[in-house]
Amino acid sequence: MDLANGVISAELLHAQAHVWNHIFNFIKSMSLKCAIQLGIPDIIHNHGKPMTLPELVAKLPVHPKRSQCVYRLMRILVHSGFLAAQRVQQGKEEEGYVLTDASRLLLMDDSLSIRPLVLAMLDPILTKPWHYLSAWFQNDDPTPFHTAYERSFWDYAGHEPQLNNSFNEAMASDARLLTSVLLKEGQGVFAGLNSLVDVGGGTGKVAKAIANAFPHLNCTVLDLSHVVAGLQGSKNLNYFAGDMFEAIPPADAILLKWILHDWSNEECVKILKRCREAIPSKENGGKVIIIDMIMMKNQGDYKSTETQLFFDMTMMIFAPGRERDENEWEKLFLDAGFSHYKITPILGLRSLIEVYP
């Protein structure tokens, strides 16, 4: 590419800007992480009104030499949509910072906060494997995570309490938000059920919320022993240490929240077959409830599609899984011996899928 070949200067400079933007796109993620670690969303929230830059700097745990740099961090956070500028008083020019819907999800004590998910995914332990992506394409390791650490993500987490705890809390924070929407928009999915097993349910945030909402419904969380060790159940909630590839406790319905995207097609079929063995016939109310992504095909907006693509790449880094479109989901269900399914798109970038034997 050169100007002599008919490429005009504007096109060349636009292409350069596009490359630059992608080189430095990680800065948005690191700025977000920094804002959380400094407590910026909570400080602004606790202020109770638009917070000026000097007021914010006075509250931040920053070295005096860094106070003049805070504005630059705030500027990228505003540009990224995590904060907004608003006049402090009507009729005056002075502006202060306020939270947006996105930054309200980052408050430390908010019940729907996904702060742990941000900190977990941007932890150096989980960003390191991305630097091994090209090396992985040239070897036969299962994942780039394996290339970076010489063992699988699940094996690493099972032996490293720091990663295990941060990952479980990240999944729990996502579960709290998702369950609040599910119980508001999709309560009917649990109608007629007397028992449910949450496979790979972690610390049980989803199952606990379902058990509280439906006191007659007996809920069981199935996960690996190091995940459920020491967890206490309740009247209609209990924990079961086991392997979903081996056997799943019998129940009217099996819940798979964000599980199947971790695994290859062959492994998904094995899991689904274990699910089918654990539930009664459709006539007797048996079904599998799946919460997962269905990849859009030119249906969503640019950012939604891009976010799903990000998740698919993330699966490639950490697990042998992938995000799937509807045709790929349907093939899994048929290969596992199920007869039909129903999709209810009420969970944002994820969908509620009911699969019947």
Curated annotation (Swiss-Prot):
Which GO MF terms does the UniProt record name?
O-methyltransferase activity; protein dimerization activity; resveratrol 3,5-O-dimethyltransferase activity; S-adenosylmethionine-dependent methyltransferase activity
Write out the similarity annotation.
Answer: Belongs to the class I-like SAM-binding methyltransferase superfamily. Cation-independent O-methyltransferase family. COMT subfamily.
Q: Which key words are in the record?
A: Methyltransferase, S-adenosyl-L-methionine, Transferase
Keyword Protease among UniProt keywords: no
| InterPro entries assigned to the protein according to its UniProt record, in alphabetical order | COMT-like, O_MeTrfase_dom, Plant_O-MeTrfase_dimerisation, SAM-dependent_MTases_sf, WH-like_DNA-bd_sf, WH_DNA-bd_sf
SUPFAM superfamilies with a match to the protein in the record: S-adenosyl-L-methionine-dependent methyltransferases, Winged helix' DNA-binding domain
Q: What induces it?
A: Expression in leaves is induced by different stresses, such as downy mildew (P.viticola) infection, ultraviolet light, and AlCl(3) treatment.
- Pfam families on file: Dimerisation, Methyltransf_2
- Class of enzymatic activity (EC top level): transferase
Catalytic reaction annotation: trans-resveratrol + 2 S-adenosyl-L-methionine = pterostilbene + 2 S-adenosyl-L-homocysteine + 2 H(+)
Q: What is one Gene Ontology biological process annotated in the Swiss-Prot or TrEMBL record?
A: biosynthetic process
Q: This protein is called what? A: Trans-resveratrol di-O-methyltransferase
The yes or no answer to whether the keyword S-adenosyl-L-methionine is present is yes
Give the annotated active site.
261 (proton acceptor)
EC number(s) recorded for this UniProt protein: 2.1.1.240
Q: What does this protein do?
A: Catalyzes the biosynthesis of pterostilbene from resveratrol. Pterostilbene has both antifungal and pharmacological properties. Also has activity toward resveratrol monomethyl ether (RME).
**UniProt-annotated binding residues for S-adenosyl-L-methionine:** 200, 223, 243-244, 257
